[in-house]
Structure formats: C-alpha cells, structure tokens
Amino acid sequence: SRGLGDVYKRQVLKEALETLSEQPGCDFGMHVIPYCHQRGDKIMAYNYQGYWKDVGTLSAYWEANMELIDIIPEFNLYEEFWRIYTKTDVIPPQYFSADSKVNACIVGDGTEVYGEISNSVIGAGVVIEEGAVVTNSIIMNNTVIKKGAKIEKSIIAESVEVGENAELGVFEEAENKYKPKVYSGGLVT
C-alpha cells in the first residue's frame, strides 16, 4: 500500500519470487506478501512519507515517466535535496542538430537528436535519426531510431534498433489477445 516500505531478506524474497514466478499476473502486494505471511516468514514494514509510485504495470511505468516531464512534477528530479549518487559513464553531452525539433523531453547524456521528439523520456546514448518522430514515449539507453521511423506511446528497451520507416504505436487501439490485462492500454513495448 502507498506509504509503506517493505524490507526483505534477500534469500526469503528470492525463494518467494521463484515459487510464484509462474503465477499469472503475480503482484507483490496481492501475492508475494501473503505467500511469505502464510509461510511464516517475518514481515516488517515502515511508514514512508516520501515520493512513492506503484509501477507494477507497463501503463503505470509509462505514466510515472511521463509525469517527470511535467513543469513541476511530483517527483522533481531538479530539487536540491534529490541528489543522485551513481557511477555514470563518461560520455559527451546531448547533441541536437539544427533541424531537430524538441518539445518537453528529458534527454540523457550522449544522445544525438536529428529528428523530432516530443513529450518523451530519452535515455543516454540514443540516436534519433533525421525524419524520425518520437512522441509520448520512453526510449531506453543505446537505442537507435532510424530515419523516418514513427514511435508513439511506446516503451522501447535498451540497445534496440528501430528500422527505417517503422511505425510503432501509430494505430487504432486494440485489445491484446495474449495478455489483455497486462498489455492493454494503448502502449507498445
């Protein structure tokens, strides 16, 4: 539930996740915690008052990322107290060609934009070629979006190459026949 942080011993959590991995739609709060409780594992929680967002579905993950683009997002990465301590690769800053178009995006270091990006979160080391259009999407690190590709409301994994003139997410919304509860919502992954 919102505002509660759960702490687990690694081995206990690993065993629970392995046991429940085959269960369709396995959810932490609905399945893992009750499973550990039934097994007699010690369960502890603490009242957490900071930012928290359930990103247990692709739609929720997409929404949380899109919220980062808001003028003043609830989870404001630019607040002085939100220091990010991490080891990062030494790569050049972003590059935007004279012909590129950028509107309301977060763009990682080393990214080169020759096309058009709007309302998107773009990871580090991404290349968006001339004529490519990315809208309302999450593009993870080291991905190449080739010339003329159109990507809309999609989550693209890292180190992927989207081919020339490919179209992802540019369609009428349709129910996913394989896992409708997991993948419905107009997202392409």
Predicted features along the sequence, with ranges:
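General structural signal for secondary-structure boundaries
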Residues: S1-R2, T189
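Left-handed beta-helix
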Residues: Q11, T19-T189
